[in-house]
Regions:
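Hydrophobic membrane-targeting signal helices
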Residues: 10-13, 17, 79
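Transmembrane helix-loop-helix hairpins at the membrane interface
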Residues: 23, 33-147
């Protein structure tokens, strides 16, 4: 239940950030082409397989060996992208990796982090595919838009 709640919270926070902040809109625009050609079944398959592989590697294998902080940092670094929003994506992935690792540390099970990760990936891939964003207006969006 903890993992599912965290996954839903992160997916909701992603939507709020994309609607409100220029940096999140830019990241959304840079990632959106990756969903081109994905079907609903493809999104589910990608969300499940990537989550399973990453949780087995980062939380199951690396966290017991490297610890919570280092596995989270490595998780973020390995999510590095090309493009102007790469630092945002890597930072976000580091924070999420830390939280997933904390769930694993608290519960001693990969079930929670896996549920969270699959929900985050599935819901965010669906959102990326189905929602376009308008270009941000100037630098003011860095601190949020006013409407």
């Amino acid at each position: 239940a903890l993992g599912a709640c965290f996954g839903l919270l992160v997916a909701f926070a992603t939507r709020v950030c994309v609607q409100r902040f220029a940096w999140a809109k830019n990241l959304h625009r840079e990632l959106r082409p990756l969903t081109r050609g994905l079907t609903g079944t493809g999104i589910v398959a990608l969300a499940l397989t990537s989550s399973l592989g990453e949780e087995l590697l980062f939380r199951g294998l690396l966290q017991p060996w490297l610890g919570l902080w280092l596995q989270a940092l490595l998780f973020g670094v390995l999510h590095q992208l090309a493009g102007s929003s790469r630092w945002v994506w890597a930072s976000w992935a580091t924070l999420v990796g830390f939280a997933l690792g904390a769930i694993f540390a608290l519960t001693g099970s990969l079930a929670g982090p896996l549920a969270a990760h699959a929900l985050i990936n599935g819901l965010n891939l669906s959102y990326l595919k189905s929602h376009d964003t308008e270009p941000p207006a100037g630098l003011g969006g860095l601190l949020g838009s006013r409407g």
